Amino acid sequence: MSERQGAGTTNGKDKPSGENDGQKKVQEEFDIDMDAPETERAAVAIQSQFRKFQKKKAGSQS
C-alpha cells in the first residue's frame, strides 16, 4: 500500500534530483492510540506474520 514509484518513472515534476537537497523533508506525525482494540489486533497480526517469516527464513538456511 505504499506509494513508491519505480525507477525511471516521473510524477509530472521535471526537477533534477539534486535540486531539493537543501530542503528539509518534513515528516508527518501520527497520533496512534496504542490502547485501541484495532491497534492491538493489527499488532498481533503483524507479529504473527513476522514470526512466520522468521521461521521460514530459519528453515531455509539450515
Curated annotation (Swiss-Prot):
Protein family (similarity comment): Belongs to the PCP4 family.
What is the phylogenetic placement of the source species in the record? Eukaryota, Metazoa, Chordata, Craniata, Vertebrata
According to the record, the residues making up region (Acidic) are 28-40
Q: Which gene encodes it?
A: PCP4
- The segments labelled Disordered in the record are 1-40
MF (Gene Ontology): calcium ion binding; calmodulin binding
GO cellular component terms, semicolon-separated:
cytoplasm; protein-containing complex
Describe its partners and assembly state: Binds to both calcium-free and calcium-bound calmodulin. The affinity for the calcium-bound form is 50-fold greater.
Recorded protein name is: Calmodulin regulator protein PCP4
**Which species is listed as the source?**
Bos taurus
State where composition is biased (Basic and acidic residues): 12-28
The keyword Transcription regulation appears for this protein:
no
What are the entry keywords?
A: Calmodulin-binding
- Name its GO BP terms in alphabetical order: positive regulation of CAMKK-AMPK signaling cascade; positive regulation of neuron differentiation
Q: What is known of its domains?
A: Mostly intrinsically disordered, with residual structure localized to the IQ domain which mediates the interaction with calmodulin.
